[in-house]
């Protein structure tokens, strides 16, 4: 943690102590470990999550844009918080809807993702594959690991670990040439194992597109 972040934790403890929300345990370290250490927080405590969007200068969400996103996403789990943080960093060119805005739309209306995939033309089996990998982030690939795992699935493209890692690197770079080469290989591999063109198209142009540099 930075010095400024440590200072914020210290000040937070001062406020909590002053308002009798926690008790002094003899030292800052002992008090922190008793009340605020990640291992002792109650992650199923709704009240704790309800106040997260109201926190001033929340760690990793301390800009005006990220604070607004935090308020809109209303995280109620570590996974929600992690997804919001990851998706904020994704700003693909020429996107009609930013990843974070799509996440908010899907999170607020779980049926919206289902309907979008139906409208795109995906069948039940294809939607099931996406659900396996993307349900925890409401239909978005919020990490490069998910890009790799999807490409390795034998119902998608059947990549090897090495090939999926190369794909991950290629789509993250701001290189039209590398991205086009990666796209051609992805579609080629998918076609060879019988994956429908429309499914490959959705994964590339909707799921993977959010991670493109």
Locate predicted features:
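Mg2+-dependent phosphoryl-transfer active-site scaffold
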Residues: 1-213
């Amino acid at each position: 943690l930075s010095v400024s972040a440590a200072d914020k934790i210290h000040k937070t403890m001062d406020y909590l102590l002053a308002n009798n929300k926690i008790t002094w345990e003899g030292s800052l370290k002992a008090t922190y470990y008793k009340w605020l250490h990640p291992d002792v927080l109650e992650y199923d405590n709704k009240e704790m999550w309800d106040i997260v969007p109201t926190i001033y200068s929340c760690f990793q969400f301390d800009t005006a844009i990220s604070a607004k996103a935090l308020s809109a996403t209303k995280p109620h789990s570590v996974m929600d918080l992690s997804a919001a943080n990851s998706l904020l960093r994704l700003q693909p060119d020429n996107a009609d809807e930013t990843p974070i805005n799509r996440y908010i739309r899907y999170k607020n209306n779980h049926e919206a993702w289902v309907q979008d995939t139906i409208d795109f033309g995906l069948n039940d089996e294809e939607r099931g594959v996406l659900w396996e990998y993307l349900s925890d982030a409401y239909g978005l690939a919020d990490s490069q690991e998910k890009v790799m795992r999807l490409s390795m699935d034998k119902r998608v493209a059947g990549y090897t670990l090495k090939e999926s890692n190369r794909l991950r690197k290629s789509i993250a770079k701001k290189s039209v040439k590398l991205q086009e080469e990666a796209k051609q290989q992805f579609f080629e591999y998918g076609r060879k194992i019988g994956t429908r063109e429309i499914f490959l198209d959705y994964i590339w142009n909707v799921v993977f597109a959010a991670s493109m540099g």
